[in-house]
């Protein structure tokens, strides 16, 4: 009896491992991947980098968009974080933080503010907002950059999906500014 069970176990193992004859296709076992909804959502902060500064609930409360995956990096004194949904490459939201700078408000606006940006008030020592049109496969972007009270350079950039409307962009201008203000504390 144990010999028969061992032989049966070996036959099943060889069949699953692809050692069956080509004519025996029914012996192949295929396990479909789990749907994305079944995956456990890791906190954004678990990605490290600038992701430690926020979580998905905080972002959703400010922007009305639910993100579920985060990636981060740190090079020298610059930390970054990008969050996305599971369903598509856009929208996405990126945050970059340069830990410290010698720039003052004038230097920031003269050298860090993009040419087509609009100066913002009420955000750190100096700030700007820039909207760009859709490009490539993604939609328009809203970018807010500022020099924080703690002398950090911070940038938020929301990239829309291709189908975003002008009203979506206008609405995101206000929401992204509120998120920037929530991130811009006296300590950072």
Regions found by a protein language model. Give the residues of each.
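Bacterial N-terminal signal peptides that target proteins for export
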Residues: 1-8
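A small/polar (G/S/T-enriched), proline-flanked helix-loop surface module common
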Residues: 22-188
């Amino acid at each position: 009896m144990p010999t028969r069970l061992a032989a049966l176990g070996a036959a099943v193992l060889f069949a699953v491992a692809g050692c069956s004859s080509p004519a025996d296709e029914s012996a192949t076992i295929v396990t479909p991947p789990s749907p994305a909804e079944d995956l456990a959502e890791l906190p954004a902060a678990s990605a490290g980098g600038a992701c430690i500064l926020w979580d998905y609930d905080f972002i959703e409360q400010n922007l009305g968009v639910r993100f579920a995956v985060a990636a981060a990096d740190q090079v020298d004194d610059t930390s970054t974080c990008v969050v996305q949904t599971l369903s598509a490459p856009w929208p996405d939201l990126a945050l970059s933080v340069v830990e410290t700078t010698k720039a003052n408000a004038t230097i920031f606006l003269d050298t860090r503010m993009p040419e087509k940006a609009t100066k913002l008030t009420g955000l750190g020592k100096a700030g700007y907002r820039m909207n760009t049109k859709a490009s490539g496969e993604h939609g328009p972007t809203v970018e807010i950059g500022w020099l924080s009270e703690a002398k950090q350079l911070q940038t938020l950039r929301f990239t829309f999906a291709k189908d975003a409307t002008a009203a979506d962009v206008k609405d995101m201008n206000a929401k992204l500014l509120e998120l920037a203000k929530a991130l811009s504390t006296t300590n950072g």
